[in-house]
Amino acid sequence: MKKLVATAPRVAALVEYEDRAILANEVKIRVRFGAPKHGTEVVDFRAASPFIDEDFNGEWQMFTPRPADAPRGIEFGKFQLGNMVVGDIIECGSDVTDYAVGDSVCGYGPLSETVIINAVNNYKLRKMPQGSSWKNAVCYDPAQFAMSGVRDANVRVGDFVVVVGLGAIGQIAIQLAKRAGASVVIGVDPIAHRCDIARRHGADFCLNPIGTDVGKEIKTLTGKQGADVIIETSGYADALQSALRGLAYGGTISYVAFAKPFAEGFNLGREAHFNNAKIVFSRACSEPNPDYPRWSRKRIEETCWELLMNGYLNCEDLIDPVVTFANSPESYMQYVDQHPEQSIKMGVTF
């Protein structure tokens, strides 16, 4: 059997493995479909993650260096690529009561022919309803971050909303904002194909940031007022600078991206200083949730799964391209790392 592994920075390969015996609380799944994570996973793949030599210390709530003799946060050769899988249970441990052999399920896991997952008190292992879409299922993870971005920005009926970066998270945020009652939804992305999909699913306008004063265009489209909410998913300094320029007085930027380091020139003066801008850093998996105790990550996940399975969210167009597992190393390097403009969220069939 084979699994997709990062053997070196920016190098993916299929590697042989043998399954271990499952424990009493586990199930083994034969994977049929899957998808990688195009955001933070790619930072890891490029060896650009702070987690390689540092760890986020929960007690101090800050990054601290790993001890010199401790394992690195990412070890190439062992680093398995992939985020979500859909497949059929082929083995159940003796303590498993909520699942059975033959069940079709979705869960977090790497791109490999089989995965072993805890199946006792694990709400993240989801049963696939009859006839449900695997493409919607593998968007379970990005949907959570899109939902938290929309909720943390307090999008309300009638708001002018901008979504910057139309990858999977941004595309789902477009759908959620429009369905939440935003009167004008504007997408920002340089890739025409992504903009076309966003328009099909709720965007009233899309802007190409290349050669465009995005902030001024947002003000023009909103009668000089600016956006009540801007959801920033790209992580680029220019995008945040444009968002500060296009934000309405007292508006909110919901910063969803795991940002890249900002080069010299980023300016928190100018419009940011004059327009009482608010920046909220949004992360679905940071607990306690800003709306705790009413909301938690579990509630976000439960809600996202329901919306994905009942068709409220439509992610069929977002899984593009779809490649075979046999071709996944080359496809990962091309579509996820080297030419991300050629994809939104890559799907993998087994």
Swiss-Prot record:
One of its GO terms (molecular function) is zinc ion binding. Its EC number is 1.1.1.-. Keywords: Carbohydrate metabolism, Metal-binding, NAD, Oxidoreductase, Zinc. InterPro entries: ADH-like_C, GroES-like_sf, NAD(P)-bd_dom_sf. Catalyzes the NAD(+)-dependent oxidation of the hydroxyl group at C3 of D-gulosides leading to 3-dehydro-D-gulosides. Probably functions in a metabolic pathway that transforms D-gulosides to D-glucosides. Is also able to catalyze the reverse reactions, i.e. the NADH-dependent reduction of the oxo group at C3 of 3-dehydro-D-gulosides leading to D-gulosides. In vitro, can oxidize D-gulose and methyl beta-D-guloside, and reduce methyl alpha-3-dehydro-D-guloside and methyl beta-3-dehydro-D-guloside. However, the actual specific physiological substrates for this metabolic pathway are unknown. Belongs to the zinc-containing alcohol dehydrogenase family. This is D-guloside 3-dehydrogenase. It comes from Escherichia coli (strain K12).
